[in-house]
């Protein structure tokens, strides 16, 4: 009965990883925008 725990961990990690990728992409976009200025 490890599947419920594993699925819970995966469902908990997916939004965190998506948020991390979104934040890093946003920071890189802002940095590139500042460099273009």
Curated annotation (Swiss-Prot):
This is Cytochrome b6-f complex subunit 5. InterPro entries: Cyt_6/f_cplx_su5, Cyt_6/f_cplx_su5_sf. One of its GO terms (biological process) is photosynthesis. It is found in: Plastid, Chloroplast thylakoid membrane. The 4 large subunits of the cytochrome b6-f complex are cytochrome b6, subunit IV (17 kDa polypeptide, PetD), cytochrome f and the Rieske protein, while the 4 small subunits are PetG, PetL, PetM and PetN. The complex functions as a dimer. Keywords: Chloroplast, Electron transport, Membrane, Photosynthesis, Plastid, Thylakoid, Transmembrane, Transmembrane helix, Transport. It is a single-pass membrane protein. Belongs to the PetG family. Component of the cytochrome b6-f complex, which mediates electron transfer between photosystem II (PSII) and photosystem I (PSI), cyclic electron flow around PSI, and state transitions. PetG is required for either the stability or assembly of the cytochrome b6-f complex. One of its GO terms (cellular component) is chloroplast thylakoid membrane. The chain crosses the membrane at residues 5-25. GO terms for molecular function: electron transporter, transferring electrons within cytochrome b6/f complex of photosystem II activity. It comes from the Eukaryota.
């Amino acid at each position: 009965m490890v599947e419920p725990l594993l699925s819970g961990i995966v469902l908990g990690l997916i939004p965190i990883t998506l948020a991390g990728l979104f934040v890093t992409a946003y920071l890189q976009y802002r940095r590139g925008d500042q460099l273009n200025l």
